[in-house]
From Swiss-Prot:
Gene: pheS
GO cellular-component term (any): cytoplasm
UniProt xrefs under SUPFAM superfamilies: Class II aaRS and biotin synthetases, tRNA-binding arm
Cofactor note: Binds 2 magnesium ions per tetramer.
Protein name: Phenylalanine--tRNA ligase alpha subunit
Self-association state and partner proteins as the record states: Tetramer of two alpha and two beta subunits.
Organism in which the protein naturally occurs: Dechloromonas aromatica (strain RCB)
Keywords tagged on the record: Aminoacyl-tRNA synthetase, ATP-binding, Cytoplasm, Ligase, Magnesium, Metal-binding, Nucleotide-binding, Protein biosynthesis
Xref: Pfam families: Phe_tRNA-synt_N, tRNA-synt_2d
Length: 348
């Protein structure tokens, strides 16, 4: 029988010289394969006398265990060396701060709307909503705008087309949020008209509106917030008080002057343009047109089913985008809608 200690020693030396896992398996076959040295010794046990077989078998198994131990240790050493090499190649500085999860933020126009809604809610106004694709009746007729009014022309209003390219029957993209007021007044009359006395209507109507216009201060799609207060004894003095208090709260300053200039709108009478002048800052001393307003025209109330002899009201309309530009000192309206994150992140 071959010297078992020599076989174990040869195996240990052979395994230690290998650094490749495939080569290690090939060397393993020399000792533990089907024709390996240890395997051949085990096969030869049958030729030994019974009195020697037991002793020889035990010695061979001890040698086999020693070879397997050396093999497994070398396998683990090769695996660890490969892992260490990979970690060194892909080394990370674990002391570096991790990447923070990106967080979104509200668009500045949305922030402005939330502020407007909050300020008007504090004095009892509700927020009303309505469709952006509107009927000609609610957009124009209900607002006392006659058939021959220039605002009805395709130069100012987006009319919708049917699938065959023909013009849809009096369906358009709303040019203001006044249709929300008309629909709300009709629903209010339907709900309370039989009671003899209706509760006051106090709403703001924010939303997207559409007009054929596009330059640095105008967009074919923009945001508008209109307001309506209808009740008994509502006056122009109430309108002036609401507007002045809102503007001072919105801009967070008493250092501004509000001016009402006579104007014309078909849905209000009398009508006025609202200007503001700041007494300090970059806009100091400049009058800036900021909104339109007026007492609700009696015809608008009649069309909604409200008696203009008993009830009066006022309405106003702010450009939400215009307020946002003034609030943040932005000169070009288009910047808000170009989707440039470098610009928008400044407001978060």
């Amino acid at each position: 029988m071959e010297n078992l200690d020599q076989i174990v020693s040869e195996a240990q030396v052979a395994f230690a010289a290998i650094s490749d896992p495939d080569a290690l398996e090939q060397v393993k076959a020399r000792f533990l394969g089907k024709s390996g040295q240890i395997t051949e010794l085990l096969k030869g046990l049958g030729k030994l006398p019974p009195e020697e077989k037991k002793t020889a078998g035990a010695a061979i198994n001890v040698a086999k265990t020693a070879v397997e131990t050396a093999l497994n240790e070398r396998r683990e050493a090769i695996r660890k060396a490969a892992l260490d090499a990979r970690l060194a190649e892909e080394a990370l500085d674990v002391t570096l701060p991790g990447r923070a999860e990106a967080r979104g933020g509200l668009h500045p126009v949305t922030r402005t709307l939330e502020r407007i809604e909050s300020l008007f809610a504090s004095i009892g106004f509700e927020v009303a909503d309505g469709p952006e694709i509107e009927e000609d009746f609610y957009n124009f007729t209900a607002m006392n705008t006659p058939e021959d009014h220039p605002a009805r022309s395709m130069h100012d209003t987006f009319y919708l087309q049917n699938s065959d390219g023909t013009l849809a029957d009096k369906v358009l993209l709303r040019t203001h949020t006044s249709p929300i007021q008309a629909r709300y007044m009709q629903a209010h009359v339907k709900r309370y008209g039989q009671l003899g006395k209706m509760p006051e209507i106090r709403i703001i109507a924010p939303g997207r509106v559409y007009r054929v216009d596009s330059d640095a201060t105008h967009s074919p799609m923009f945001h508008q917030v209109e307001g309506l207060w209808v009740g008994e004894g509502v006056s122009f003095a109430d309108l002036k008080g609401v507007i002045a208090n809102f503007l001072k709260s919105f801009f967070e300053t008493d250092d501004l002057t509000v001016r009402f200039r006579p104007s014309f709108f078909p849905f209000t009478e009398p009508s006025a343009e609202i200007d503001v002048a700041f007494m300090s800052g970059a806009l100091k001393g400049r009058w800036l047109e900021i909104a339109g307003c007026g007492m609700v025209h009696p015809n608008v109330l009649r069309i909604a089913g409200i008696d203009p002899e008993k009830y009066t009201g006022f309405a106003f309309g702010f450009g939400q985008d215009r307020l946002t530009m003034l609030r943040y000192g932005i000169n070009d309206l288009r910047l808000f809608f170009e989707g440039d994150l470098r610009f928008l992140r400044q407001f978060n």
